[in-house]
Amino acid sequence: MENITLDELGNFTLTNLRKLAKEHKIEGYSTIPKMELLNRLCYSIATAEGLIYSYGELDIINETYGFLRNTPQNIDVYVSNSQIKKFGLRQGDVIVGEVRKPLNDEKNFGLLKLIYVNGEKGELSRQRPIFDDLTPSYPIERLELGEGTVSSRIIDLIAPIGKGQRGLIVAPPKAGKTTILSDLANDILKYNKDVQVWIILIDERPEEVTDIKENVKNAEIFAATFDENTSVHLSVTEKVLEAAKREIEKGNNIVILMDSLTRLARSYNIEMPSSGKLLSGGIDPKSLYMPKKFLGAARKIRGGGSLTILATALIETGSRMDEVIFEEFKGTGNMELVLDRALQQLRLFPAVDILKSGTRKEELLYSKREFDSILKLRKFLLKLNEAEALKFLMDLIKRYSSNKDLLENIDYELKL
Protein backbone atom coordinates (compact mmCIF):
# COMPACT_ATOMS: atom_id res chain seq x y z
CA MET A 1 0.00 0.00 0.00
CA GLU A 2 1.87 3.06 -1.27
CA ASN A 3 1.42 6.84 -0.75
CA ILE A 4 -1.13 6.61 2.03
CA THR A 5 -1.91 9.84 3.87
CA LEU A 6 -2.68 9.71 7.57
CA ASP A 7 -6.07 11.31 6.93
CA GLU A 8 -7.05 8.30 4.78
CA LEU A 9 -6.27 5.70 7.44
CA GLY A 10 -9.54 6.37 9.26
CA ASN A 11 -11.47 4.99 6.25
CA PHE A 12 -9.61 1.67 6.31
CA THR A 13 -11.29 -1.54 7.43
CA LEU A 14 -9.70 -3.53 10.24
CA THR A 15 -8.47 -6.09 7.68
CA ASN A 16 -6.65 -3.44 5.64
CA LEU A 17 -5.23 -1.83 8.77
CA ARG A 18 -3.80 -5.20 9.78
CA LYS A 19 -2.23 -5.69 6.33
CA LEU A 20 -0.60 -2.29 6.64
CA ALA A 21 0.48 -3.01 10.21
CA LYS A 22 2.16 -6.21 9.02
CA GLU A 23 4.12 -4.17 6.44
CA HIS A 24 5.21 -1.76 9.18
CA LYS A 25 6.18 -4.66 11.47
CA ILE A 26 3.88 -3.67 14.32
CA GLU A 27 4.03 -6.39 16.97
CA GLY A 28 0.80 -8.19 17.86
CA TYR A 29 -1.14 -6.45 15.06
CA SER A 30 -3.58 -9.37 14.67
CA THR A 31 -5.05 -8.93 18.17
CA ILE A 32 -4.86 -5.15 18.63
CA PRO A 33 -8.24 -3.31 18.63
CA LYS A 34 -8.91 -1.08 15.62
CA MET A 35 -8.49 2.26 17.41
CA GLU A 36 -5.16 1.27 18.97
CA LEU A 37 -3.96 -0.11 15.62
CA LEU A 38 -4.89 3.17 13.90
CA ASN A 39 -2.95 5.17 16.49
CA ARG A 40 0.16 2.99 16.20
CA LEU A 41 0.09 3.12 12.39
CA CYS A 42 -0.14 6.93 12.38
CA TYR A 43 2.86 7.07 14.70
CA SER A 44 4.84 4.52 12.65
CA ILE A 45 4.12 6.06 9.23
CA ALA A 46 4.80 9.61 10.43
CA THR A 47 8.08 8.56 12.06
CA ALA A 48 9.17 6.88 8.81
CA GLU A 49 8.44 10.15 6.96
CA GLY A 50 10.46 12.19 9.45
CA LEU A 51 7.42 13.82 11.09
CA ILE A 52 6.82 13.99 14.82
CA TYR A 53 3.49 12.35 15.61
CA SER A 54 2.17 11.09 18.91
CA TYR A 55 -0.96 9.73 20.54
CA GLY A 56 -2.20 9.52 24.10
CA GLU A 57 -5.06 10.02 26.54
CA LEU A 58 -6.22 13.58 27.13
CA ASP A 59 -5.92 14.75 30.72
CA ILE A 60 -7.72 18.11 31.11
CA ILE A 61 -6.36 20.34 33.90
CA ASN A 62 -8.83 22.59 35.76
CA GLU A 63 -11.20 22.54 32.76
CA THR A 64 -8.79 24.72 30.75
CA TYR A 65 -5.75 23.24 28.99
CA GLY A 66 -4.66 19.61 28.90
CA PHE A 67 -1.91 17.09 28.21
CA LEU A 68 -1.70 13.86 26.25
CA ARG A 69 -0.50 11.19 28.68
CA ASN A 70 0.94 7.69 28.11
CA THR A 71 2.43 8.61 24.73
CA PRO A 72 4.81 6.23 22.89
CA GLN A 73 7.69 8.71 23.39
CA ASN A 74 6.96 8.94 27.16
CA ILE A 75 6.41 12.69 26.90
CA ASP A 76 3.47 14.88 27.89
CA VAL A 77 2.05 16.77 24.90
CA TYR A 78 0.40 20.12 25.64
CA VAL A 79 -3.14 20.65 24.27
CA SER A 80 -4.37 24.25 24.32
CA ASN A 81 -7.73 25.46 25.58
CA SER A 82 -8.65 26.68 22.08
CA GLN A 83 -8.05 23.17 20.65
CA ILE A 84 -10.17 21.63 23.41
CA LYS A 85 -13.04 24.01 22.63
CA LYS A 86 -12.71 23.80 18.84
CA PHE A 87 -12.94 20.00 18.74
CA GLY A 88 -15.16 19.53 21.80
CA LEU A 89 -12.52 17.40 23.50
CA ARG A 90 -13.28 15.60 26.75
CA GLN A 91 -11.39 13.97 29.59
CA GLY A 92 -10.08 10.55 28.54
CA ASP A 93 -10.24 11.13 24.77
CA VAL A 94 -7.53 9.22 22.89
CA ILE A 95 -5.97 11.70 20.47
CA VAL A 96 -3.46 11.24 17.64
CA GLY A 97 -1.85 14.16 15.86
CA GLU A 98 1.26 16.00 14.76
CA VAL A 99 3.27 17.58 17.56
CA ARG A 100 6.05 20.16 17.67
CA LYS A 101 9.11 20.49 19.85
CA PRO A 102 9.14 23.00 22.75
CA LEU A 103 9.78 26.60 21.70
CA ASN A 104 12.01 29.00 23.65
CA ASP A 105 11.31 28.49 27.37
CA GLU A 106 8.46 25.96 26.91
CA LYS A 107 8.80 22.70 28.83
CA ASN A 108 6.50 20.45 26.82
CA PHE A 109 5.89 19.36 23.26
CA GLY A 110 2.71 20.90 21.82
CA LEU A 111 -0.12 19.46 19.72
CA LEU A 112 0.22 21.09 16.30
CA LYS A 113 -2.43 19.28 14.24
CA LEU A 114 -5.16 16.99 15.55
CA ILE A 115 -5.95 14.05 13.23
CA TYR A 116 -8.08 11.51 15.11
CA VAL A 117 -10.13 11.45 18.31
CA ASN A 118 -11.00 7.98 19.62
CA GLY A 119 -10.29 6.47 16.20
CA GLU A 120 -12.52 8.91 14.29
CA LYS A 121 -11.67 12.05 12.34
CA GLY A 122 -11.18 15.07 14.57
CA GLU A 123 -13.86 17.23 12.93
CA LEU A 124 -16.51 14.67 13.94
CA SER A 125 -15.72 14.88 17.65
CA ARG A 126 -18.05 17.84 18.31
CA GLN A 127 -21.03 15.80 17.06
CA ARG A 128 -20.70 13.16 19.79
CA PRO A 129 -23.51 12.72 22.33
CA ILE A 130 -22.78 13.44 26.00
CA PHE A 131 -22.73 10.37 28.26
CA ASP A 132 -24.92 11.89 30.98
CA ASP A 133 -27.57 12.87 28.40
CA LEU A 134 -27.97 9.30 27.07
CA THR A 135 -31.06 7.37 28.21
CA PRO A 136 -30.31 4.37 30.47
CA SER A 137 -32.49 1.25 30.38
CA TYR A 138 -32.56 -2.24 31.86
CA PRO A 139 -30.08 -4.70 30.30
CA ILE A 140 -31.86 -6.84 27.71
CA GLU A 141 -28.95 -8.68 26.05
CA ARG A 142 -27.07 -11.34 27.98
CA LEU A 143 -23.32 -11.77 27.83
CA GLU A 144 -22.73 -15.25 26.40
CA LEU A 145 -21.05 -17.46 29.01
CA GLY A 146 -22.98 -20.71 28.51
CA GLU A 147 -20.06 -22.63 27.01
CA GLY A 148 -17.33 -21.25 29.26
CA THR A 149 -15.66 -22.48 32.45
CA VAL A 150 -17.71 -23.99 35.27
CA SER A 151 -17.65 -20.72 37.24
CA SER A 152 -18.85 -18.68 34.25
CA ARG A 153 -21.61 -21.19 33.48
CA ILE A 154 -22.83 -21.11 37.09
CA ILE A 155 -23.00 -17.31 36.89
CA ASP A 156 -24.87 -17.58 33.57
CA LEU A 157 -27.53 -19.77 35.23
CA ILE A 158 -27.79 -18.18 38.68
CA ALA A 159 -26.85 -14.50 38.26
CA PRO A 160 -26.78 -13.74 34.50
CA ILE A 161 -24.84 -10.71 33.33
CA GLY A 162 -26.47 -8.43 30.80
CA LYS A 163 -24.78 -5.73 28.76
CA GLY A 164 -25.07 -2.71 31.05
CA GLN A 165 -25.26 -4.72 34.30
CA ARG A 166 -24.17 -3.14 37.58
CA GLY A 167 -22.96 -6.03 39.67
CA LEU A 168 -21.33 -6.69 43.02
CA ILE A 169 -19.22 -9.75 43.74
CA VAL A 170 -19.52 -10.08 47.52
CA ALA A 171 -16.38 -11.86 48.65
CA PRO A 172 -14.76 -12.84 51.95
CA PRO A 173 -10.96 -13.43 51.95
CA LYS A 174 -9.69 -16.61 50.28
CA ALA A 175 -12.99 -17.32 48.51
CA GLY A 176 -11.47 -17.38 45.01
CA LYS A 177 -12.66 -14.00 43.67
CA THR A 178 -9.48 -13.38 41.65
CA THR A 179 -9.82 -16.72 39.85
CA ILE A 180 -13.49 -16.04 39.12
CA LEU A 181 -12.62 -12.61 37.68
CA SER A 182 -9.93 -14.16 35.45
CA ASP A 183 -12.32 -16.87 34.21
CA LEU A 184 -15.04 -14.29 33.56
CA ALA A 185 -12.70 -12.00 31.62
CA ASN A 186 -11.45 -14.81 29.39
CA ASP A 187 -14.93 -16.20 28.71
CA ILE A 188 -16.45 -12.78 27.99
CA LEU A 189 -13.67 -12.11 25.47
CA LYS A 190 -13.98 -15.56 23.91
CA TYR A 191 -17.75 -15.68 23.43
CA ASN A 192 -18.63 -11.97 22.98
CA LYS A 193 -16.68 -10.51 20.07
CA ASP A 194 -18.39 -7.09 20.25
CA VAL A 195 -17.26 -6.44 23.84
CA GLN A 196 -14.06 -4.95 25.24
CA VAL A 197 -12.94 -6.08 28.70
CA TRP A 198 -11.07 -3.72 31.02
CA ILE A 199 -9.76 -4.85 34.40
CA ILE A 200 -9.03 -2.39 37.23
CA LEU A 201 -6.94 -3.63 40.15
CA ILE A 202 -6.83 -1.23 43.10
CA ASP A 203 -4.63 -1.68 46.19
CA GLU A 204 -3.70 -5.20 45.06
CA ARG A 205 -0.52 -7.18 45.65
CA PRO A 206 1.99 -6.80 42.77
CA GLU A 207 2.16 -10.57 42.22
CA GLU A 208 -1.64 -10.72 41.76
CA VAL A 209 -1.40 -8.02 39.10
CA THR A 210 1.25 -10.08 37.30
CA ASP A 211 -0.93 -13.19 37.59
CA ILE A 212 -3.93 -11.45 36.02
CA LYS A 213 -1.79 -10.04 33.19
CA GLU A 214 -0.41 -13.49 32.41
CA ASN A 215 -3.78 -15.27 32.56
CA VAL A 216 -5.96 -12.72 30.73
CA LYS A 217 -4.28 -11.91 27.44
CA ASN A 218 -6.64 -9.67 25.47
CA ALA A 219 -8.05 -7.42 28.19
CA GLU A 220 -6.89 -3.89 29.04
CA ILE A 221 -5.46 -4.04 32.56
CA PHE A 222 -5.08 -0.97 34.79
CA ALA A 223 -3.44 -1.41 38.17
CA ALA A 224 -2.45 0.60 41.24
CA THR A 225 -0.79 -1.65 43.82
CA PHE A 226 -0.94 -1.31 47.61
CA ASP A 227 2.59 0.15 47.77
CA GLU A 228 1.57 3.15 45.63
CA ASN A 229 0.13 6.38 46.96
CA THR A 230 -3.66 6.41 47.41
CA SER A 231 -3.84 9.39 45.04
CA VAL A 232 -2.63 7.02 42.28
CA HIS A 233 -5.54 4.66 43.10
CA LEU A 234 -7.99 7.51 42.57
CA SER A 235 -6.30 8.81 39.43
CA VAL A 236 -6.24 5.40 37.72
CA THR A 237 -9.92 4.74 38.46
CA GLU A 238 -11.15 8.16 37.36
CA LYS A 239 -9.19 8.08 34.10
CA VAL A 240 -10.47 4.61 33.23
CA LEU A 241 -14.06 5.68 33.92
CA GLU A 242 -13.77 8.74 31.67
CA ALA A 243 -12.19 6.65 28.90
CA ALA A 244 -15.06 4.14 29.21
CA LYS A 245 -17.63 6.93 28.90
CA ARG A 246 -16.00 8.06 25.65
CA GLU A 247 -16.35 4.52 24.28
CA ILE A 248 -20.04 4.35 25.27
CA GLU A 249 -20.67 7.67 23.51
CA LYS A 250 -19.42 5.96 20.34
CA GLY A 251 -21.90 3.11 20.84
CA ASN A 252 -19.37 0.50 21.99
CA ASN A 253 -19.81 -2.17 24.69
CA ILE A 254 -17.35 -2.11 27.59
CA VAL A 255 -17.11 -4.53 30.52
CA ILE A 256 -15.12 -3.31 33.55
CA LEU A 257 -14.09 -5.88 36.17
CA MET A 258 -12.87 -4.17 39.34
CA ASP A 259 -11.07 -5.55 42.38
CA SER A 260 -12.00 -4.00 44.69
CA LEU A 261 -14.63 -1.33 45.29
CA THR A 262 -13.99 -1.60 49.03
CA ARG A 263 -10.33 -0.65 48.69
CA LEU A 264 -11.23 2.20 46.35
CA ALA A 265 -13.58 3.58 49.01
CA ARG A 266 -10.78 3.29 51.60
CA SER A 267 -8.47 5.30 49.33
CA TYR A 268 -11.09 8.03 48.89
CA ASN A 269 -11.55 8.09 52.66
CA ILE A 270 -7.85 8.92 53.01
CA GLU A 271 -7.65 11.47 50.18
CA MET A 272 -10.93 13.40 50.49
CA PRO A 273 -11.02 16.48 52.76
CA SER A 274 -12.99 15.71 55.91
CA SER A 275 -16.64 16.75 56.00
CA GLY A 276 -16.65 16.69 59.80
CA LYS A 277 -19.00 13.70 59.88
CA LEU A 278 -18.09 10.07 60.46
CA LEU A 279 -19.99 6.84 59.98
CA SER A 280 -19.35 3.81 62.14
CA GLY A 281 -15.91 2.37 61.39
CA GLY A 282 -14.33 5.79 60.86
CA ILE A 283 -15.45 6.39 57.28
CA ASP A 284 -16.46 9.83 56.06
CA PRO A 285 -19.78 9.67 54.15
CA LYS A 286 -18.35 12.16 51.64
CA SER A 287 -15.68 9.62 50.62
CA LEU A 288 -18.37 7.24 49.31
CA TYR A 289 -19.65 9.70 46.71
CA MET A 290 -17.06 8.97 44.00
CA PRO A 291 -17.08 5.15 44.38
CA LYS A 292 -20.89 5.29 44.06
CA LYS A 293 -20.52 7.51 41.00
CA PHE A 294 -18.13 4.95 39.51
CA LEU A 295 -20.49 2.02 40.08
CA GLY A 296 -23.50 4.09 39.03
CA ALA A 297 -21.96 4.76 35.61
CA ALA A 298 -22.82 1.19 34.56
CA ARG A 299 -25.84 1.24 32.26
CA LYS A 300 -27.38 0.03 29.03
CA ILE A 301 -27.95 2.93 26.67
CA ARG A 302 -31.24 2.82 24.83
CA GLY A 303 -30.39 2.39 21.16
CA GLY A 304 -26.66 2.54 21.86
CA GLY A 305 -23.75 0.93 23.68
CA SER A 306 -23.38 -0.32 27.23
CA LEU A 307 -21.07 -0.06 30.22
CA THR A 308 -21.06 -3.17 32.40
CA ILE A 309 -19.31 -2.96 35.77
CA LEU A 310 -18.70 -5.93 38.06
CA ALA A 311 -16.89 -4.87 41.23
CA THR A 312 -15.84 -6.90 44.25
CA ALA A 313 -17.00 -5.86 47.73
CA LEU A 314 -15.02 -7.32 50.63
CA ILE A 315 -16.72 -8.78 53.72
CA GLU A 316 -15.60 -10.73 56.80
CA THR A 317 -12.22 -8.99 56.79
CA GLY A 318 -12.37 -8.10 60.49
CA SER A 319 -12.61 -4.40 59.61
CA ARG A 320 -15.69 -2.49 60.71
CA MET A 321 -14.98 0.04 57.94
CA ASP A 322 -15.24 -2.66 55.27
CA GLU A 323 -18.58 -3.83 56.66
CA VAL A 324 -19.94 -0.26 56.58
CA ILE A 325 -18.73 0.22 53.00
CA PHE A 326 -20.48 -2.99 51.95
CA GLU A 327 -23.72 -1.95 53.65
CA GLU A 328 -23.60 1.40 51.84
CA PHE A 329 -23.24 -0.30 48.45
CA LYS A 330 -25.65 -3.13 49.12
CA GLY A 331 -28.70 -2.63 46.93
CA THR A 332 -27.01 -0.17 44.53
CA GLY A 333 -26.33 -2.91 41.98
CA ASN A 334 -28.83 -4.89 39.94
CA MET A 335 -26.86 -8.13 40.17
CA GLU A 336 -25.14 -9.83 43.11
CA LEU A 337 -22.79 -12.79 43.18
CA VAL A 338 -22.17 -13.92 46.77
CA LEU A 339 -19.11 -16.04 47.57
CA ASP A 340 -18.89 -18.19 50.72
CA ARG A 341 -15.59 -19.06 52.37
CA ALA A 342 -17.15 -22.15 54.01
CA LEU A 343 -17.79 -23.59 50.55
CA GLN A 344 -14.17 -22.93 49.60
CA GLN A 345 -13.03 -24.74 52.74
CA LEU A 346 -15.07 -27.73 51.55
CA ARG A 347 -12.95 -27.53 48.36
CA LEU A 348 -15.94 -26.50 46.27
CA PHE A 349 -14.99 -24.02 43.55
CA PRO A 350 -16.38 -21.64 42.51
CA ALA A 351 -17.57 -20.99 46.07
CA VAL A 352 -20.82 -19.34 44.94
CA ASP A 353 -23.71 -19.15 47.39
CA ILE A 354 -26.39 -20.05 44.87
CA LEU A 355 -29.28 -19.27 47.20
CA LYS A 356 -28.15 -15.67 47.86
CA SER A 357 -26.94 -14.76 44.36
CA GLY A 358 -29.14 -13.38 41.60
CA THR A 359 -29.95 -10.69 39.03
CA ARG A 360 -32.83 -8.22 39.02
CA LYS A 361 -35.11 -8.36 35.98
CA GLU A 362 -33.36 -11.55 34.86
CA GLU A 363 -36.43 -12.48 32.81
CA LEU A 364 -35.34 -9.80 30.30
CA LEU A 365 -32.09 -11.70 29.67
CA TYR A 366 -33.55 -15.14 28.93
CA SER A 367 -35.99 -16.43 26.36
CA LYS A 368 -39.33 -17.55 27.88
CA ARG A 369 -38.39 -21.21 27.51
CA GLU A 370 -34.99 -20.66 29.15
CA PHE A 371 -36.53 -18.66 31.99
CA ASP A 372 -39.11 -21.37 32.72
CA SER A 373 -36.30 -23.94 32.93
CA ILE A 374 -34.26 -21.63 35.19
CA LEU A 375 -37.23 -21.29 37.56
CA LYS A 376 -37.58 -25.08 37.78
CA LEU A 377 -33.87 -25.41 38.56
CA ARG A 378 -33.97 -22.68 41.21
CA LYS A 379 -37.01 -24.20 42.95
CA PHE A 380 -35.19 -27.52 43.13
CA LEU A 381 -31.98 -25.94 44.48
CA LEU A 382 -33.91 -24.08 47.20
CA LYS A 383 -34.72 -27.44 48.80
CA LEU A 384 -30.99 -28.06 49.40
CA ASN A 385 -28.44 -26.37 51.64
CA GLU A 386 -25.68 -24.17 50.16
CA ALA A 387 -23.07 -26.92 49.75
CA GLU A 388 -25.53 -29.48 48.38
CA ALA A 389 -26.97 -26.97 45.90
CA LEU A 390 -23.53 -25.99 44.58
CA LYS A 391 -22.35 -29.61 44.34
CA PHE A 392 -25.54 -30.63 42.48
CA LEU A 393 -25.25 -27.75 40.01
CA MET A 394 -21.55 -28.38 39.35
CA ASP A 395 -22.21 -32.07 38.65
CA LEU A 396 -25.11 -31.10 36.37
CA ILE A 397 -22.96 -28.64 34.41
CA LYS A 398 -20.21 -31.21 33.87
CA ARG A 399 -22.68 -33.56 32.16
CA TYR A 400 -23.45 -31.06 29.38
CA SER A 401 -21.20 -29.11 27.03
CA SER A 402 -23.34 -25.97 27.25
CA ASN A 403 -26.02 -24.39 29.43
CA LYS A 404 -28.39 -24.45 26.47
CA ASP A 405 -28.24 -28.27 26.35
CA LEU A 406 -28.58 -28.45 30.13
CA LEU A 407 -31.75 -26.33 30.20
CA GLU A 408 -33.29 -28.32 27.35
CA ASN A 409 -32.90 -31.48 29.47
CA ILE A 410 -33.80 -29.96 32.85
CA ASP A 411 -37.07 -31.91 33.21
CA TYR A 412 -35.19 -35.17 32.74
CA GLU A 413 -32.43 -34.20 35.18
CA LEU A 414 -34.86 -33.06 37.89
CA LYS A 415 -37.13 -36.04 37.18
CA LEU A 416 -40.13 -33.77 36.60
From Swiss-Prot:
Species name: Streptobacillus moniliformis (strain ATCC 14647 / DSM 12112 / NCTC 10651 / 9901)
Binding-site residues for ATP, renumbered to this chain: G162, K163, G164, Q165, R166, G167, K174, A175, G176, K177, T178, T179, R205
Gene coding for it: rho
Protein name per Swiss-Prot or TrEMBL: Transcription termination factor Rho
Subunit and partners: Homohexamer. The homohexamer assembles into an open ring structure.
Molecular-function GO terms, alphabetical: ATP binding; ATP hydrolysis activity; ATP-dependent activity, acting on RNA; helicase activity; RNA binding
Rho RNA-BD domain boundaries: 51-121
Family: Belongs to the Rho family.
Lineage: Bacteria, Fusobacteriati, Fusobacteriota, Fusobacteriia, Fusobacteriales
One Pfam short name: Rho_RNA_bind
